[in-house]
Amino acid sequence: MLLSLKWLREFVPFEGTAAELGDRLTMLGLELEEIIRPFDAIEPIVVGHVVSRERHPEADKLSVCKVDVGQGEPLDIVCGAPNVAAGQRVPVALVGTTMPGGMVIKKAKLRGQPSHGMICSERELGLGEDHDGIMVLPESFRIGARLVDELDLDREVCDIAITPNRADCLSVLGLAREVALAFGLPLTMPALDLKEEGADASNALRIDIPDASLCPLFHGRVLEGAAVRKSPAWMRYRLIAVGVRPISNIVDVTNYILMELGQPLHAYDLDLLAGGRIEVSAAREGERLTTLDGVERVLTSNDLLIRDGEKPVGLAGVMGGAETEISDKSSRVFLEAAVFRPGTIRKTARRLGLSSEASYRFERGVDQVVCTYAMNRAAQLIAGLSGATLRPGICHNEPLPWQAPVLRFRRARGEALLGISLDETFCRETLERLGCKVDAADAADWKVTAPSHRRDFEREADLIEEVARVRGMDTIEPVLPKVMRPLDRAGAPESKYSFWLRLKHWAAGLGLNEAINYSFVGQKDLDHLNLAVDGRIPIMNPLTADQNVLRTELAPGLLQNLRHNIAQGNAGLRLFEVAHIFEADATSDTTARERARLDILVYGSRYDSQWPHVEADADYADIKGIVEHCLAFLHLEGATFTLAASHPFLMPCVDVAVQGRQVGVIGRVRPEIADAYHARKDAWLADLDLDVLRELHDAARIAFRSLPVYPPVRRDITVAAPGSLQVGAVLDHILGLRLPLLCGVELIDVFEPEGKDERNLTFRMTFRHASRTLKDAEVDKERDKVAHSLVEKLPVRI
């Protein structure tokens, strides 16, 4: 937002410098990005007086002028402008001056006549587009004075970065409120003095709004007898200073009010509006409108359109239509002021790539209460600058009047959030200076009515933040956080985020690196993983086409991380992410459901290349071991791993269950999918349901068990099994025998002979007695029971 200090001082009596203003606003959260001096390039230009003008003896179109610039003898200047005449006050660039376009003025001879400077046009000075002749100045301008002083131009402009939640600051008025707040200054609004004449015009146009949510307010005023011409210099130069191109007095007023009050306006040629009505409604699919830039736009049902009785006349909140624009022939004007739904305007502007100063403000929300004041101020200016007659009455429709939210404010809550003591008087005065109405009938729980321009006031924390902002965030001393847990909460289940944090520490301690990805992904990312279309939640106003839906799995983000790391030359990757996934759920109050997930991705070299090791890549055993370690960390025993029939993007895929409840899956990313992410080796992924794991963890009871005193005895057994037999089936069978001395079984080796559809599986069994040392004979007897049972019950041989 470009803020002219001269313009600002019409609202608040601020006498400081631009730097002082920027420093204070920055501390209030409105960062000063740059101080611009828009007319620095014409600082050397002086006011001259044309003493005489003679025709050039060698060129009919040139004049030889003697120009007094207040430096003694008049200067000889050759000028080619047809409108130069003796007695004029004119802008003069002296020898040595660098013009805005980069040209340096030098002594020269033009057709034999010496010239010691240049008499300038508006375009040469960057003060307009007029280049038909020189710029003629008022006779009151002092000879030899600097042009910028005599024109009283806006010399300093602050470029203020406005955060998306502070739409109220996208105007001189909005920033003036902040300056008044920061420096304790009074705020003065421009006075209204409406001179209305003629018959009532409130019924000149009927305003129809079928859907109030799309347009809460639409009204306008009628002006007749307007003369469309160039705006006065003060308005043109002020608009130029803040980056707006002057067009004509009518259009310039609408832009002036937009920058001054933050309310976009639009002026129609009333004679070109047909049918005596205006309708604001959704466009029909495929409907067309030629906008002011001359481009024909094809509209969708998501666009908001303004129509007269016969045709579209404007793309609401974005740009007006070419058919009803103000031209030199216009004399009757309909001045529109309205409020539109921000999301609708944002979507249309993004889709069409048509961002304007108006749409930028409508997207963020405008002040519905100030809308009428802005329209009346614009009408007053148009009447004064064009000679128009303002008709009494307003064409008005407000189907959804503004309802000011009433929020609670508890000083004790503010002190708890900020960690500081808050003075009651300071809090009340701050809220009132912000424009709030404070009902302090309950001293501990105030009722605060938010002002219409602060659409970001939605909850108590917003008011507390404002109090802290005005007090000064830099005055709040940092303190170490205190974590207090009452004794009556001892043993209670930990919070979801505490559970997440413990898992993150576990994963980091295991050597995994945390990934944090956007919740937004592209439809094509989910399609690529063969994920179901049903249940996806689209984003209404996506930042990009690649982020137009909420993720239904964490895998897309991790696979993108994989692609990036491979591109950076990382040979081995160990990633994890703890986050939510989202699915549509018609039974939910919000029509959506969030689920917590822990995903782990391993890829490439098993060991760090800096350590001596046998070269090997991560495989199923690695990802399974990590999952088993996680379950052990959560004190969850008895996990089963069962081959899944199918999975959208994992093959093979194994279901992981604990106590009969599925807690996730592990498997290899399908090669064709991994290849699309530039993976040249197997990528293994685990997807665990944290909601289920947390429930199981909270229900788990840890019992004390003394450490074993007597040594274990181990026996290995190798079975030849068909390739279709799962290892889990063998393990489950051995453990299912419930041998009293058997305390553990693990797979230690797999051998697959060439040309045979079988594999040799070697298991290591651990035996132990709690109160004595085992003898070999009794251990061998237990092993024989296992061997006999395996041969009898399973298709294996020892």
Swiss-Prot record:
Residues 39-148 form the tRNA-binding domain. Residues 402-478 form the B5 domain. SMART domains: B3_4 (SM00873), B5 (SM00874), FDX-ACB (SM00896). Residues 708-798 form the FDX-ACB domain. GO terms for molecular function: ATP binding; magnesium ion binding; phenylalanine-tRNA ligase activity; tRNA binding. Its EC number is 6.1.1.20. It is found in: Cytoplasm. GO terms for cellular component: phenylalanine-tRNA ligase complex. It comes from the Bacteria. SUPFAM superfamilies: Anticodon-binding domain of PheRS (SSF54991), Class II aaRS and biotin synthetases (SSF55681), Nucleic acid-binding proteins (SSF50249), PheT/TilS domain (SSF56037), Putative DNA-binding domain (SSF46955). InterPro entries: aa-tRNA-synth_II/BPL/LPL, B3/B4_tRNA-bd, DNA-bd_dom_put_sf, Fdx_antiC-bd, Fdx_antiC-bd_sf, NA-bd_OB-fold, Phe-tRNA-ligase_IIc_bsu, Phe-tRNA-ligase_IIc_bsu_bact. Keywords: Aminoacyl-tRNA synthetase, ATP-binding, Cytoplasm, Ligase, Magnesium, Metal-binding, Nucleotide-binding, Protein biosynthesis, RNA-binding, tRNA-binding. This is Phenylalanine--tRNA ligase beta subunit.
